[in-house]
């Protein structure tokens, strides 16, 4: 069998995500339906081939504007070096990118921003839990730090739920605007809107 040809055909024909043996086939359209039913505004294929992990993005975390740097197992430095993060994602060939879009009264509508962020995290966790059943090795990267626990156990004790923990795309060094562009979707949908973006590495 010509394995190079087989890999080429799988890459060229994104009709679904093929899982061999006793596992199932879940098509992109099915993933879209699941994501839309959960509440995501947009669900598309993630262009994994173009993902770059940038030191300058990781450095933005170190400025600690979100007050989570060094305080959460999902954030730097606990989530690993960029080299370790690159090793994490290198084993994946397929993924999806998802978005939640909110409407704002004006550019100073902080309440609307927080409501959309909370809604996105709710969608994200539901999608993670749903996909985990189909893809046991799922890697989920969200928007913002992990909020599974009211207070993270870092650094005093091990993570309480390592299988449910998730890091952000930025923690892994991804420039979200670039990932969106490379995956063929918008990052900004115009005045009066705000969008939160996450991604799932499936296999």
How would you describe each model-predicted region?
Residues 28, 41-72, 76-203:
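Catalytic cores of enzyme domains
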Residues 9-25:
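Short, Lys/Arg-enriched N-terminal segments with co-localized hydrophobic residues
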């Amino acid at each position: 069998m010509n394995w190079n040809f087989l890999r080429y055909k799988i890459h060229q024909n994104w009709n679904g995500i093929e899982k061999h043996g006793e596992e199932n086939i879940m098509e992109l359209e099915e993933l879209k339906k699941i994501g839309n039913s959960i509440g995501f505004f947009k669900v598309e294929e993630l262009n994994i081939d173009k993902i770059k992990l940038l030191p300058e993005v990781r450095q933005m975390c170190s400025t600690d504007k979100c007050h989570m740097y060094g305080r959460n197992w999902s954030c730097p430095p606990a989530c690993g070096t960029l080299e370790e993060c690159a090793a994490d994602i290198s084993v994946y060939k397929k993924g999806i990118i998802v978005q939640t879009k909110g409407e704002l009264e004006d550019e100073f509508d902080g309440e609307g921003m927080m409501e959309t962020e909370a809604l996105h995290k709710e969608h994200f966790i539901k999608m993670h839990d749903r996909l985990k059943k189909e893809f046991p090795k799922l890697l989920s990267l969200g928007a913002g730090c992990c909020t599974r626990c009211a207070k993270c156990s870092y650094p005093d004790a091990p993570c309480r739920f390592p299988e449910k923990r998730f890091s952000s795309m930025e923690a892994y060094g991804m420039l979200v605007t670039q990932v969106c562009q490379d995956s063929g979707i918008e990052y900004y949908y115009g005045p009066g809107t705000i969008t939160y973006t996450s991604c799932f590495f499936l296999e």
